[in-house]
């Protein structure tokens, strides 16, 4: 299988490895961000999915273009299907998740906490009697601390964010306003494609002037949960998990076999890997309304990325 499992390019400066992305800080204040095919969930890498990195980059490109009038973003250029050149930002230490439904499988999801009996969370209150995957009265923000050291994200309330001096009140007000506006616009566009944008994660940073800017990715199958709109009502009535366009079913496969936060995760079978690859491709086409064009250059993905990034090598 043609996969980009890593993108270590020695000629590029200031390398930093993220969960699924390789980063290189350039002298001009920009950053090279390469999306690999690594699939991350439960704070670990589960496997690699063919074309996943290209889907993420191109889906984010579509959404950054759709939302540039709502919130400034980090995009400078796209030299390769898997690569974005972005402004280098000081990433804010709060991860912002916006949720429109009582859903999720992670330890910080409102459904997980709700099933544990919690009703007060993230500075809000939920009533008794709600069902799995039920729509919320209105979208809510569920912020968590950003685990820069590889630890687990921890739930936060808006007041805790300010009290702990993670953000100023003004920063939180701006960030939350952006997040809700981005989410509502995303839901509107997704609905036109027959999809429900269930929840999503945003990452923000500040530039040299302190301006808050959207970073990382937006409304991709990795950062978001999508359901098929035409089957949601029936699935909800029958208590079934809605048909999804994201990595949620891989999470579900793992969750049925172990506690991924405590146990060793079993190897993901090849048929599930290929199925997941097709899900990512289908998601791109359904979300954007555009046909996915895989690379057919004959090169390995790493060789192609390297060639397209040669203009950024020092001294070139």
Curated annotation (Swiss-Prot):
Superkingdom assignment: Bacteria
EC number: 6.3.2.6
Gene3D superfamilies on file: ATP-grasp fold, B domain, Phosphorylase Kinase, domain 1
SUPFAM superfamilies: SAICAR synthase-like
Molecular-function annotations in GO: ATP binding; phosphoribosylaminoimidazolesuccinocarboxamide synthase activity
Catalytic reactions on record: 5-amino-1-(5-phospho-D-ribosyl)imidazole-4-carboxylate + L-aspartate + ATP = (2S)-2-[5-amino-1-(5-phospho-beta-D-ribosyl)imidazole-4-carboxamido]succinate + ADP + phosphate + 2 H(+)
Biological processes annotated in GO: 'de novo' IMP biosynthetic process
Enzyme class: ligase
PROSITE patterns named in the record: SAICAR_SYNTHETASE_1, SAICAR_SYNTHETASE_2
Keyword tags: ATP-binding, Ligase, Nucleotide-binding, Purine biosynthesis
UniProt pathway: Purine metabolism; IMP biosynthesis via de novo pathway; 5-amino-1-(5-phospho-D-ribosyl)imidazole-4-carboxamide from 5-amino-1-(5-phospho-D-ribosyl)imidazole-4-carboxylate: step 1/2
GO CC, alphabetical: cytoplasm
Family recorded in the similarity comment: Belongs to the SAICAR synthetase family.
Cited HAMAP family: SAICAR_synth
Protein name, UniProt field: Putative phosphoribosylaminoimidazole-succinocarboxamide synthase 2
Organism: Agrobacterium fabrum (strain C58 / ATCC 33970)
